[in-house]
């Protein structure tokens, strides 16, 4: 009996939905089986994204080493994970106090992390510090602090665990970076510079360690769209927030502004992408909506056009305030 043509589209939708559901279930099962018994180190685990990531890996049976700058928040996350899990299916997380802004003690912390289980299977570098201000208002000390947290801290930790991975000829680095590691915007000089630097380091590392069976994944995302995911306080800058909602006069920037607050990524989505990247050993993931994606291509293919548009946005007073 022939299927009426009017039923073809609904049937295709049902079939597609079923395949999509089965695919997601299979991938979720594979993700859990891949991370089970793996030693996973998460930096800044107390952030919104870090805690979501910790929950997913903990539920998957990973042996977690949770790092963060606040012991109280680490203990709170520890209690949350342990109270909502089956002890027979999960491992008790280990906690390590880690503050990349204090580089003097970083070598001791790296040793403590390595001694937790004697090995590291997955290192997730999630720590980040943000600052937005005109370059003339940023001190050199602030530049150094940003570089410590966003660059020197992660690479010091990576170098510390690398010998363990080389000895075992297995391991994975996951860098949770920012779109500004590929696309620099005004009023974010030191932040964008640190993100470009750490991106370059892990890109180079990927080629160097592949022969040892070690993989490197970088995840570049737009801003994290969640109230709990606030930037780490930096310093009091002379920039004063303006309550005005003036619209940029440049039509291109007016469109961009209308998308700035709607094109973020949630901590939950980002954490799920990290688990998938570990499962698939993805080399590079770009987690962004169309506007920043198009901007990235314009920057690569038509740099002159990109620079002109960005400069026009800075000259536009309303746009400059929103960029800040």
Curated annotation (Swiss-Prot):
Q: Which residues form a coiled coil?
A: none
Keyword annotations: NAD, NADP, Oxidoreductase, Secreted, Signal
Q: Which CDD domains match?
A: 11beta-HSD1_like_SDR_c
Q: What is its EC number?
A: 1.1.-.-
One GO MF term = oxidoreductase activity, acting on the CH-OH group of donors, NAD or NADP as acceptor
- Any GO CC annotation of this UniProt entry: extracellular region
Is the Hydrolase keyword given for this protein?
A: no
Q: Which residues form the signal peptide?
A: 1-17
Q: Which PROSITE patterns does this chain map to?
A: ADH_SHORT
Which residues are recorded as binding NAD(+)?
A: 41-65
Q: Which residues bind substrate?
A: 178
UniProt enzyme class: oxidoreductase
- Provide the protein's localization: Secreted
Q: Kindly name one Pfam family recorded for this protein.
A: adh_short
Which sites are catalytic? 191 (proton acceptor)
- From its record, what is one biological process in GO terms? intracellular calcium ion homeostasis
Keyword Transferase attributed: no
Q: Which PANTHER family match?
A: DEHYDROGENASE_REDUCTASE SDR FAMILY MEMBER 7C-A, PTHR44668
Q: Please explain the role this protein plays, according to its UniProt record.
A: Putative oxidoreductase.
Record-stated family: Belongs to the short-chain dehydrogenases/reductases (SDR) family.
Q: What name appears for this protein in its UniProt entry?
A: Dehydrogenase/reductase SDR family member 7C-A
Biological classification of the source? Eukaryota, Metazoa, Chordata, Craniata, Vertebrata
